[in-house]
Amino acid sequence: MKVLRTPEKRFKNLKNYPYKPHYTAVESKKGDNIRIHHIEEGPKKGPTVVCFHGQPAWSYLYTKMIPYFLKEEVRIICPDLPGYGKSDKPSKREDYSYQNQVDWMVQWLKKNELENLTFFGQDWGGLIGLRVVAKEPERFNRVVVGNTGLPYNPNVPKSVLKEREEFIKNSETPTLYDIYNNLKGMKNKSPKHQILKFMYWQKYCWDTEDLPVGLLMSMIGGGNKKLSTSLYYAFVQMGAEKFYPFKPEIAKAFDAPFPSREYKMGVRSMPMQVPIIPDSSLAAQKEARDFFKSWNKPFLSAFAGNDPITNSMEKDVLKMCPKALKAPNIGGGHFYQWTKPKELSDIIIKFIKADT
């Protein structure tokens, strides 16, 4: 396995990221070492929350939330998934299976001897993290999830599978305009409808070798004016992103892990791994979902409520875990850790304190 490591100089002078790095070596199935990075702040004797990020973000996504946890003396740990942030980046598409990510993060959890945890996950952080919780339940006291879930669609019509396959193989790469229009159309629709919308994001990410992560996060995560975003997008389309003179801080931060396109295999390939159709993860998904049906520890569903990509997943999460509680929807879109940091932190902290 060829593994890439982002030079530390790429992370110098990042705004609001003064945190000491922690590294843990895990092992791939082939015996290769993969170094996983995490940040860890707050009192070791206090309650501990572990926050998993999604695609295409990294632990920087939680920088706005960290001060709220520290104020309440809650220890917060935020790892970077392999392929993201300061963690090592395997270079091949086949390295980024759903199962590999689960296995690597279980190793990370065990090697750091973490226990008495509150888990929080969003996007891929929830897909991976919920499977980790199901594998190591004794290490977790409670679970909070938002804008995520454990997708399980074993009975997708053949006509839908064929239409998706044809699109992925033969259609032109979608534009960001195509993606925007299709993703916003996912809200509260049937699984069939969502598959044929989400495929635009899957194809765009895979086809775009130099995925403009900074631009995407500045659009999805807020922090950029409409005119500035349009201008920024024009530079990206011309292949002149590095010459764009008004790059926002959020874009700089989320571009930092990727010195070149070779480092982006994880962010490109993982959307295709989302199990919205029957695939190799089907049995493991069912096993994890069955586990949460009998989960008897505190579980909180805390969705934004205005994220069209994941809105319909909240009902599924509540069905999957019958004893789960539902928090009020706070808005903020897909990456509400960035847009609603205080509101989301308050929900998690209140949930922890109610149970301690």
Predicted regions and their residues:
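C-terminal alpha-helix
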Residues: 347-355
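Catalytic histidine-centered segment of alpha/beta-hydrolase-like enzymes
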Residues: 332-341, 345
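Typically the conserved alpha-helix immediately C-terminal to a functionally engaged Cys/Sec
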Residues: 64-67
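Structural cue for short, hydrophobic secondary-structure segments
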Residues: 51-54, 78
